[in-house]
Amino acid sequence: NDTNQDITAVSLRLNAGTVMADSVNQLETTVGSLTASSAGSVYLLEADDLTVGSVAVSVNRVGSAAGVSTVSDAAQADVRTSANGSIVLRSTAGSLTLTDGNTDGVVLSANGSGNVLVQAQGTGSDLTVNASVQSGTGHVTLKAADAVNLSANVTTSSTGTLSVTAGGALTQLG
């Protein structure tokens, strides 16, 4: 954990074959929208407002004959882990908005015993959950310095617990 941002971008699409940072040194970002897929855990610390949803990528590729072609990749959606990976998504001074990036209704999915922590820190920072947040059997914690607005399911099963903490209003719609 340092004072420098690791990634600054309008939109960020992450895909890792193992873990994405760790609990001691999170991946520090300043981005507007985000999607992540990891075979292990995901640890992200956002500097300001962030929307989780869908990100598509188009790049210019230079071929062996120095020609340039545009390559587009299908959109990646949401934040998902496998192999019992946890999801830790926090902002230091901004609101977090969780939206479904595809049509499955789920925005955050921690596999197996993976835990979920989503925390909007800083004065006036809200957490808005517009799509389902889930863990197989892990714990799910949602926190905001100001309001927490829930308009979707938050689920776990078996030994997992759910915790929602709002410094301001707690609203459940639907």
Segments from the language model and where they lie:
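Extracellular lectin-like interaction modules
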Residues: 1-174
